[in-house]
Amino acid sequence: MVKEKIVVIGNGFASLFFIQYFLLLPVFPIFFWFLRRVYSKYEITVIGNGEFIYFPALPEFITGKKNRKEITIDIKHFLKRRNIRFIDSVVTDIQNGGRTVITNTGTYENDVLFLGIGPAFLKDDIPGTREHTLSPCDGPDSMELFINRLNSMESGIVYLGFKVNKKDGFVSGRGGQMYECACLLDYALKEKGVRDKFEIHFFSPDISIGDTGMITDRLQERGILLDYGYEPVEFLNGWMKDNDDSFRKADLVLYSPGITGSDLVINSCLPVSKGGQIDADKYGQVKGLSNVYAAGDCASHEDPPPWVPHQAHMAQLRSQAVAKNVKAMLNGNPSNTTYRYELSCIMNMENDAMWLHMSSDNKPPFWNIFPSRSKNLIGVKNIFEKLYLFYLRYL
């Protein structure tokens, strides 16, 4: 029997959710591994770096509640239990309408291609971003460097902020993590007894001056200075330059740039959206290419509401729809499963927490059994994290 070849590029949230929903959830992984070795209709290959990082936990590096070891997993064992081949390579090109994947170590053909390759960040929008800012978007290395620099300071001015890419009509950025980082920084400095020696500023050109709401209230309660509507024209060493050529003192900057597509997206046969991302439709199908799918923060949405994100939980919903559509296509059935738009996350402030939620069908999270604001939500968030990481490590 000739097996259908499925190639998955990337080993982050979107790719792992796709695998989870495409294959049966194994209750007994050893039996499942044996069964897939004896009989499988598919030959699945994952191309990536083999390291999974649980990015939603990165802000908690600031309080010392999370560290690199706790949130990083060698994903090769997860794949091996499912009899999935892993290729430790960097994809350099995609050709032949998606059928040919070229890496730095070889070429791989496929019948179905799934793209969960992650984004690139618009670090050239503001000069000096690469040289003079740190970001949770860059992973544990950058967050550890931020903590080290913070710990070396006895006092100072810290700026936290974000920018989003609005060209595709939705929130293509990671503002939520930055709100969390700001509140956790306030908590960490208070725990050390030095909060009065630091100014914390929060800025974003994508928040209107005078904007109000629950998040703004939480920032103001903590004495965080709001620079809504502000965007520096350049980051400098210890300073930020304004458009009138004046300067603001900034001893430390934690900043999340807007999201766009990687060089692979721009330079391959993949269609590109206005915002520079993979142009995908409401079924997760890459437009104009047969049997090529994408999910996560590498791909645009089709006609999205302006508030929708595309990473983490939204990646899960889209990957689930893609898995169903790929199964239907391989079985000769219509691929017509769409996905709901949803923003759902718990904002941990250490001494408080909020469940931020919006959805296209107005359904509350988990049938509204959890409060929208309670410190107990931190425990709920930790349970979700521990369950998912346990699943990846052992099931």
Task: List the model feature ranges, each with a label.
Residues V2-I84, K167-I209:
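Beta1-alpha1 glycine-rich phosphate/pyrophosphate-binding loop at the start
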Residues V2-V7, N83-E180, L184-E191:
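FAD-binding core/adjacent interface of flavoenzyme oxidoreductases
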Residues I9, Y108-A120, K249-G258, S319:
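Short hydrophobic core segments
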Residues Y42-T45, R82-V101, D186-A280, N333-P334:
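A Rossmann-like FAD-binding core segment of flavoenzymes
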Residues R130-E154, R248-Q316:
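FAD-site-proximal beta/loop scaffold in flavoenzymes
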Residues K167-L184, T212-R222, Q311-R318, I346-M358:
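Short, electropositive alpha-helical surface patch
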Residues G173, A295-Y341:
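A conserved FAD-binding loop/helix module that cradles the flavin
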Residues A323-L395:
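C-terminal, flexible cofactor-proximal segment of oxidoreductases
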